């Protein structure tokens, strides 16, 4: 019996499968009276190259990839007709996306309708404050609660020092240090995993996400990769996004390890992740201060007195430039696509008119 079949069997045995799938009033409010007649509410639980796997109250449904389908991702809610054909995609409560890997600027959807995101960073050579800031910008843009999970605490001699460095990014950040192989340690994360709640793990390859998923599930569902001791980089062990049902009733979305994650249209997320830097900028003498050599620059003053790290400020500027460039390029591509679509429709319309005139 495969994992997705077990998922649906467990779901059907509950008294309220839709609630356990993460159905909320937000989605209920989007329904019309017609939607209650001979329709099926389904959630995307896996996305593979061949199509989407959906979970419903009655079991699982497979939708083949087709040009008429909107771009969907794991966690999305959709409406199907009685023949299990796609009707429409419901508005999302939250959406995570990034620039697709590679040189081409294209948006890749990661997960939708998530309540809490566990940002996983291992306490070994992978520990990287700038990467954590990047993930925080992504999570804040989606307006989702972030929880920093510092993994492999058993392999680190200075856990408190590294945790303190992360806490300095934001005094209100929730941070948990865990050993993925210790059940008592990973149980700290269960308070976010109650019935109806959807959580997701994001992090780079080799940080121990699959080990944490196994710990929360209480079984060996995800394969785990060995770590090369010389550089602490793990093999990719999760290659597609999928949903798991947790013992406490919550929904867990696991994502592939991402060595590259570039931001697109993420200005608000960057602003929130670097709220301290922007608060300093409000006190600069000039409203258009570039925070370089201008007199009365509060940002440079904070760098000089040590209250703001040069690294953090440089990363703030880097992420702002990155999201602006990728966003502008993507907007241009969308505009060109719309123009091409309009041109195609006009050509087809003219062709039909000529055929009708004969």
UniProtKB/Swiss-Prot annotation:
It is an enzyme of class 3 (hydrolase). GO terms for cellular component: cytoplasm. Its cofactor is Zn(2+). Binds 1 zinc ion per subunit. GO terms for biological process: ribosomal small subunit biogenesis. It is found in: Cytoplasm. SUPFAM superfamilies: P-loop containing nucleoside triphosphate hydrolases. GO terms for molecular function: GTP binding; GTPase activity; metal ion binding; rRNA binding. Signal peptide: none annotated. Keywords: Cytoplasm, GTP-binding, Hydrolase, Metal-binding, Nucleotide-binding, Ribosome biogenesis, RNA-binding, rRNA-binding, Zinc. It holds the Pfam family RsgA_GTPase. Its main location: cytoplasm. Its EC number is 3.6.1.-. InterPro entries: G_CP_dom (IPR030378), P-loop_NTPase (IPR027417), Ribosome_biogen_GTPase_RsgA (IPR004881), RsgA_GTPase_dom (IPR010914). It comes from the Bacteria. Zn(2+) binds at residues 284, 289, 291, 297. GTP binds at residues 151-154, 203-211. Residues 106-261 form the CP-type G domain. NCBIfam families: ribosome small subunit-dependent GTPase A. Monomer. Associates with 30S ribosomal subunit, binds 16S rRNA. Belongs to the TRAFAC class YlqF/YawG GTPase family. RsgA subfamily. One of several proteins that assist in the late maturation steps of the functional core of the 30S ribosomal subunit. Helps release RbfA from mature subunits. May play a role in the assembly of ribosomal proteins into the subunit. Circularly permuted GTPase that catalyzes slow GTP hydrolysis, GTPase activity is stimulated by the 30S ribosomal subunit. This is Small ribosomal subunit biogenesis GTPase RsgA 2. It comes from Vibrio parahaemolyticus serotype O3:K6 (strain RIMD 2210633). The gene is rsgA2.
